[in-house]
């Protein structure tokens, strides 16, 4: 976590930021992207929200703060990230956030949610149809699911570490996929 504290903005958001003419620095870009994600997901205070793949908690903590009557459940595959998020939530007095440590391929819950949000996590998953079926089972009747992924304009490909130059596959997306616009 020390490395990320040095190179990321104050929210520790390691997915894309939002930049327009009014944005002057990384902190503003992170804040704008978090706000835009919540707007695109049509989040309302009081909803039960599930975040799939929460990283260092940028969106989880932002939602817990800005939607204090909502119950935020976030899933991370990292015990160190869960501990980091729990510590920040406690320090900020946020009691409406629960972080679960689990691989997304194995995650199950009996809870149902009004909103499910996933930011740049599906690139780590190879069997999207299985996870889409799970997501559908976790949704209430009028729920919404926001999935934010980066993708290649034309060609999908797997992140595979074939040689030393394949640093993305080796260090960031081992076993993942670059989806395409047509996938």
Can you annotate each of these PLM segments?
Residues 46-55:
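Conserved class I S-adenosyl-L-methionine
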Residues 91-104:
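Conserved SAM-binding strand-loop segment of SAM-dependent methyltransferases
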Residues 105-116:
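A short acidic, Gly/Pro-enriched loop at the edge of an enzyme's catalytic core
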């Amino acid at each position: 976590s020390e490395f990320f504290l040095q190179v990321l903005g104050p929210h520790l958001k390691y997915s894309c930021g939002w930049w327009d003419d009014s944005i002057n620095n990384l902190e503003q870009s992170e804040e704008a992207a978090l706000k835009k994600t919540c707007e695109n997901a049509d989040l309302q205070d009081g909803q039960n929200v599930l975040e799939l793949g929460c990283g260092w908690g940028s969106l989880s903590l932002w939602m817990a703060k800005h939607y204090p009557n909502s119950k935020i459940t976030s899933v991370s595959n990292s015990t160190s990230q869960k501990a980091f998020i729990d510590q920040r939530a406690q320090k900020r007095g946020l009691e409406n956030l629960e972080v679960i440590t689990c691989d997304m391929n194995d995650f199950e819950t009996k809870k149902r949610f009004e909103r499910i949000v996933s930011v740049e996590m599906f690139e780590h998953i190879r069997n999207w149809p299985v996870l889409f079926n799970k997501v559908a089972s976790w949704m209430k009747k009028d729920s919404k699911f926001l999935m934010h992924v980066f993708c290649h304009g034309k060609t999908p490909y797997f992140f595979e570490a074939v040689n030393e130059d394949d640093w993305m596959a080796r260090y960031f997306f081992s076993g993942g996929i670059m989806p395409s616009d047509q996938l």
